[in-house]
């Protein structure tokens, strides 16, 4: 049984043949940390978390290097920090922490490496200098631009002609550009900007363009060639197209990534969920409603990853009912881990066909309720928990699941927030959190050394 993945670059479903089975390399575009992630952003993280699990199953964890970056330098970050009246570092640290909390809530594994853009400026400068030396980039009006027309096969990933690619795309106008489509590799500092958002370079004080960041970090940790590059379908153009162009031009012998995997949009009433449209729901919103993270994860896996997925209350409720059914099926059964069933693995090996994988788990649940012997019930229940665990679900006990008013993740997060408030002598906030938990019949007991325990009333 071999893993098949749809490769956007070739527009075909291919057998996954890594360059080195003992050293598999995967890069996924991570968040720009200017605001709390919405669940559309989180779909990408959950999809590639599943792919990571599948590849680990085949090749072993030590053989897989999974890099997911943090973009912590960007005009949106600058604008947001100014709007909130806080420093860039305070904003990016806060949003990065929130991102990690969200991913834990969704049951995502940590990547092998999570590099920050601001810590790799030297690598970006090195690649830009290579591009200038090879006449693929030029300096104009204190900017460094990439010359799009100098890149061979620029349209290969998008499979569209150059004019069509740029229709409806916002292009930065500059009389000094060679071509309107040329994109920025390095931009100069603006007047009255905070000093810590700009960096020294051969072209003066400034900061990198967005696209060069991922080329630099993938090169730093994975080299010139690697196996998988993942991200949302909205990144095919311009971000991934520009990544390929600048990386291949900087390293002419490089093919860059072999397999390009893209997940579909999350929609709301048929429109793409996005902050610019104002139709987004953050992961924090769902956490505050005390919707279980497993429910959201199952919802995000309920549609094939390449298809659009529409967010609505019914879809969330359906995911909750499905998990209720699974947890009820294993109730009062001494389940044990068994080998992953071959039909279940075949579904995941077929371009991560999660709808089929979920149906197979449902079928095992049905079998539990019609099983004629205890051995049959135990086998089917064990298959449920084994399959669900593999895709990051059913991480709770039946007691924890069916006592949803006691969400330990939510409670512990509030306790940590309260402890922080106490250390800062913010007694008003500390009391507010205590009362908030008391309303849910959660009693806090403060011990020495800032330790707090809790119990249900």
Swiss-Prot record:
SUPFAM superfamilies: Anticodon-binding domain of a subclass of class I aminoacyl-tRNA synthetases (SSF47323), Nucleotidylyl transferase (SSF52374). One of its GO terms (biological process) is cysteinyl-tRNA aminoacylation. It is an enzyme of class 6 (ligase). Keywords: Aminoacyl-tRNA synthetase, ATP-binding, Cytoplasm, Ligase, Metal-binding, Nucleotide-binding, Protein biosynthesis, Zinc. Its cofactor is Zn(2+). Zn(2+) binds at residues 29, 214, 239, 243. GO terms for molecular function: ATP binding; cysteine-tRNA ligase activity; zinc ion binding. A motif ('HIGH' region) lies at residues 31-41. ATP binds at residue 275. This is Cysteine--tRNA ligase. It comes from Rickettsia prowazekii (strain Madrid E).
